[in-house]
């Protein structure tokens, strides 16, 4: 009996540690994902800002209270926030040079997007759609949906021979 008890205890301890480890792993996985997202956001804004953003709002609040209580750190606070504040100021309230850049980029982006939308999908797909519609009209197609359904029926009968696909 004395030999069985420690084995049972070890088994229960092992199960308990395994379950707690599983819980810890499950608890850490989403946290690591969130920190990864926050780190990526922090790196996007400023590499120095990534470390403070790892902590939750509580960390930030504690740091702000520390900054407020200690005058030395309050002097360092604007230095830490300078790049981010500068970045946001450039975005939110652009001064004389940024608006010209913003306008130029906006027009270029809009032209590029219009060109991409108009030429590649518009002409290419439009031409293809016209070809397909004309070919299907010759085959017996009236609407695009009818041609699509007939295409699926033909494809299902010929290649797959699947009854549900053919019925659709």
UniProtKB/Swiss-Prot annotation:
| PTM field | As in other animals, several charge isomers may be produced as a result of optional post-translational modifications, such as phosphorylation of serine or threonine residues, deamidation of glutamine or asparagine residues, citrullination and methylation of arginine residues. Phosphorylated by TAOK2, VRK2, MAPK11, MAPK12, MAPK14 and MINK1.
For the modification Phosphotyrosine, the affected residues are 14, 67
Which residues, renumbered to this chain, carry the PTM Phosphoserine?
A: 7, 12, 19, 40, 56, 74, 113, 159, 163
Symmetric dimethylarginine occurs at 105
Modified positions (Citrulline) in chain numbering: 25, 31, 128, 157, 168
Mark the residues carrying the PTM N-acetylalanine: 1
Localization (cell): Myelin membrane
This protein is called Myelin basic protein
Q: What is the lineage of its organism?
A: Eukaryota, Metazoa, Chordata, Craniata, Vertebrata
Coding gene?
MBP
């Amino acid at each position: 009996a004395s030999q069985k008890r420690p084995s049972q205890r070890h088994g229960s301890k092992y199960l308990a540690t395994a379950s707690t480890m599983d819980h810890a792993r499950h608890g850490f996985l989403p946290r690591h994902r969130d920190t990864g997202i926050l780190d990526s956001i922090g790196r996007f804004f400023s590499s120095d800002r990534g470390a403070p953003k790892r902590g939750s709002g509580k960390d930030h609040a504690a740091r702000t209270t520390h900054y407020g209580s200690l005058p030395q750190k309050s002097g360092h606070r604007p230095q830490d926030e300078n790049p981010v504040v500068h970045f946001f100021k450039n975005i939110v309230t652009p001064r004389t040079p940024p608006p010209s850049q913003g306008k130029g980029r906006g027009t270029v982006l809009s032209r590029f997007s219009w060109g991409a939308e108009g030429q590649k999908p518009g002409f290419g797909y439009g031409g293809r759609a016209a070809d397909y519609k004309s070919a299907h009209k010759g085959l017996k197609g009236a609407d695009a949906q009818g041609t699509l359904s007939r295409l699926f029926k033909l494809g299902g009968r010929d290649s797959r021979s699947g009854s549900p696909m053919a019925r659709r």
